[in-house]
Curated annotation (Swiss-Prot):
EC number: 3.4.19.-
Cofactor section: Zn(2+)
Protein name per UniProt: Bacterial deubiquitinase-like protein BilC
Keyword Chaperone belongs to the record: no
Family: Belongs to the M67B family.
Length: 173
């Protein structure tokens, strides 16, 4: 018999989650976004990982300004076309896929009109997470803006108030 104790406990403790990130990795990503944004402008990253049994598991991150050094020049996150070529090349090298993107906002973690009409990855099922207050820690899970792309500039809100178990950052990720 082949089974994983971790997978069994995770299925019991967070049965409905669709996106998971280890707690230590999530904290590191948030801290790095705060550092890169300098508490003055937006910063962002692509979360890379794998999809398994309908769940996306974050394993690493690639920050927007590593792909495009001018990504934050306007104060908001803007990536130019060649940044995506670098991203897809990196994914191929690592055998990973983009499972979500995360970026910061100055106030609340909500999806702006610009976010809604310009998805970073315009693929059905893509997840966008918005961190409030330029990622200043601590950030309560309930303050995250989480959205799942449906195509045609339509999104489903997956924020904790609407889908409390969608994003899991606990020990069993």
């Amino acid at each position: 018999m082949n089974f994983s104790i971790k997978a069994t406990i995770r299925a019991w403790s967070a049965p409905e989650h669709k996106l998971a990130c280890r707690k230590q990795l999530w904290r590191k990503i948030v801290a790095e976004l705060e550092r890169r944004g300098k508490r003055r402008h937006e910063a962002g990253t692509f979360l890379l990982g794998i999809e398994r049994n309908g769940r996306k598991e974050v394993q690493s991150a690639v920050y927007y300004d590593d792909l495009d050094p001018s990504a934050y020049d306007s104060g908001v996150c803007i990536l130019h076309g060649d940044a995506f070529a670098k991203l897809w090349s990196h994914c191929r090298e690592k055998g990973l896929t983009v499972v979500a993107d995360v970026h910061t906002h100055p106030g609340a973690g909500f999806q702006s009109d610009s976010d809604r009409t310009n998805p970073m990855v315009a693929r059905q099922g893509h997840i966008a997470i918005i961190l409030p207050n330029f990622a200043r820690w601590p950030i309560r899970q309930g303050n995250l803006g989480i959205y799942e792309y449906c195509g045609q500039h339509e999104w489903l809100e997956r924020s904790p108030a609407h889908a409390p178990n969608f994003f899991y950052t606990g020990f069993w990720s």
